[in-house]
């Protein structure tokens, strides 16, 4: 139980390193120390107790020792050290794009200290007998590790607040914008679809613009990926790190998202269930539409998460609100029927996905026609819903027809939106993430199991893509080395707006034609803090 208490005390600063914005006062820190220590004593200590009891059946000596055995203590603290080491290094690896570099470095230091502690204990347990005052020495050694881990957390620099404008900055955007996000699409799926003739509009526009793959957020989390796309900032800066957030009222008033991964189910690493579910977080930096609205443009948004607000907003339709599959074009339904009959267990889900996508597209086109806007941002999840279930393992399968019809629907919606916005509109089509089969390592885990059908998924953060076409874009250009955060920075530059210094993205100059690059300077502002009234703080129309 004492070993478990030390484990809880050592894991607490690792969890705090995952929460850079949490800086509790001393009293709350003491409460946190007691909470995690008692949690570790019960759960980790209870596990170690069961392990020691089981081991005593094999090694009777362990059960015959009276009092506090220093030798047994060392052998119990070795797995504690291994758990702390693994937790520090694993969470550092699993927060590549989600955590500030200083905090990830703190996890690396913590893992190294725990590894050194474990190796030292292993050497002592094997090669040395307990000396005089061995108990005091053992407890002091473990206390030193806990102290060092808390010192690592205390010495980690706090995050910098967003730079504020001294006065309102005045900018005048140029042109119109159509910003389309197709989740779950990528070039390996898109290019063949265009070659087959499934996407004639996009194929026609392809040579008029610049395109390339996008490195997405790693590890994959949809919430962080979308927020990175529309803010141009890293997740650690815009603050949206995952789908689920929690409130820990006895520690901080701020919602927290990242939880320490380890051999325990989430969210039970938060002690004693003293937490509450929190609603989804909104980005702490202004989104693309907020920046545009702050300059005076009318912006429509459709299909984005709940934090999206524009001059008008089309939310993601619910199943009950959609017109239904029966209301779709008869020729479209007739082309789908053979494929749907081949997989009746998936047919209802596919019909629902098509109906929702069609409802979102038609509602958005109607809004643009009746309430014209200067910019439109729309997000569609159709491909992300259908590809994992309908991707065919063999060419020529009837399953392919479902995805072909999905490509045709997306292309037709894109054409309708582009015509509604006007031909002189800057067109941006982007996929924040792609889909790919499981990696060889994931397949190896299931080696020897029952035969299974592998599904494509975004788990390994496959690359997405970006396509830009319109005023200021260099035609017939292949982009290389582009990242997801680069999209918003490039769009702002093409619309004659400044780029924020705290954005992780850069302007994709290869996508800009020479005339614009020579005539339009790259302007920078400190930041675009989110204004909860709907705009970007410190930016106004000229």
Labelled PLM ranges:
Residues 109-143:
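Cytosolic-side transmembrane helix boundary signature
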Residues 163-168, 430-469, 521-522:
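Histidine-centered active-site microenvironments of extracellular/periplasmic hydrolases
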Residues 211, 445-497, 512:
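Substrate-binding rim/cap in mid-to-C-terminal beta-strand-loop elements of soluble/periplasmic
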Residues 10-27, 86-101, 125-128:
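Juxtamembrane "helix-exit" motif on the non-cytosolic side of transmembrane helices
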Residues 170-191, 205-206, 229, 292, ...:
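Beta-strand elements within well-structured catalytic alpha/beta cores of enzymes
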């Amino acid at each position: 139980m004492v070993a478990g208490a030390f484990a809880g005390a050592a894991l607490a600063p690792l969890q705090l390193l995952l929460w850079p914005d949490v800086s509790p006062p001393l009293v709350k820190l003491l409460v946190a120390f007691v909470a995690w220590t008692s949690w570790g004593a019960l759960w980790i200590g209870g596990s170690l107790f069961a392990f020691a009891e089981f081991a005593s059946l094999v090694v009777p000596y362990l059960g015959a020792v009276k009092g506090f055995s220093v030798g047994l203590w060392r052998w119990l603290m070795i797995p504690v050290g291994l758990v702390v080491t693994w937790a520090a290094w694993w969470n550092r690896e699993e927060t590549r794009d989600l955590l500030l570099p200083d905090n990830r470095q703190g996890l690396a230091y913590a893992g190294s200290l725990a590894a050194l502690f474990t190796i030292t204990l292993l050497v002592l347990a094997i090669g040395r007998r307990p000396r005089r005052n061995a108990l005091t020495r053992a407890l002091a050694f473990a206390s030193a590790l806990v102290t060092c881990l808390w010192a690592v957390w205390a010495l980690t620099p706090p995050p910098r607040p967003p730079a504020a404008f001294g006065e309102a900055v005045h900018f005048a955007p140029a042109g119109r914008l159509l910003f389309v996000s197709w989740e779950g699409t990528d070039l390996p799926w898109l290019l063949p679809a265009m070659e087959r003739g499934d996407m004639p509009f996009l194929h026609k526009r392809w040579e008029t613009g610049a395109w390339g793959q996008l490195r997405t957020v790693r590890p994959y989390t949809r919430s962080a990926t979308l927020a990175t796309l529309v803010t141009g900032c890293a997740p650690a800066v815009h603050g949206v790190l995952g789908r689920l957030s929690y409130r820990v009222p006895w520690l901080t008033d701020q919602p927290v998202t990242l939880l320490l991964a380890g051999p325990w189910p989430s969210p039970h690493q938060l002690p004693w269930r003293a937490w509450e579910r929190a609603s989804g977080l909104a980005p702490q930096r202004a989104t693309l539409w907020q920046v545009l609205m702050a300059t005076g443009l009318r912006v429509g948004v459709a299909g984005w998460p709940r934090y999206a607000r524009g001059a008008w907003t089309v939310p993601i339709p619910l199943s009950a609100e959609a017109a239904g599959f029966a209301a779709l074009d008869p020729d479209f339904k007739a082309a789908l029927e053979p494929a749907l009959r081949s997989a009746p267990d998936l047919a209802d889900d596919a019909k629902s996905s098509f109906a929702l996508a069609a409802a979102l597209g038609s509602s958005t086109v109607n809004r643009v026609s009746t309430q014209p806007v200067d910019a439109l941002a729309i997000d569609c999840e159709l491909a992300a819903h259908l590809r994992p279930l309908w991707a065919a393992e063999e060419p020529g399968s009837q399953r392919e027809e479902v995805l072909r019809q999905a490509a045709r629907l997306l292309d037709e919606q894109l054409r309708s939106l582009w015509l509604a916005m006007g031909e002189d509109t800057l067109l941006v089509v982007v996929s924040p993430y792609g889909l790919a089969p499981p990696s060889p390592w994931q397949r190896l885990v299931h080696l020897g199991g029952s035969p299974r059908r592998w599904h494509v998924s975004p788990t390994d953060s496959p690359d997405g893509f970006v396509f830009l076409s319109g005023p200021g874009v260099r035609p017939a250009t292949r982009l290389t080395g582009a990242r997801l955060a680069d999209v918003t920075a490039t769009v702002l530059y093409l619309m004659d707006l400044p780029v924020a210094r705290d954005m992780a993205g850069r302007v994709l100059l290869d996508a800009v034609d020479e005339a614009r690059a020579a005539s339009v300077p790259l302007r920078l502002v400190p930041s675009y803090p989110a204004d909860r009234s709907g705009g970007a703080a410190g930016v106004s129309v000229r």
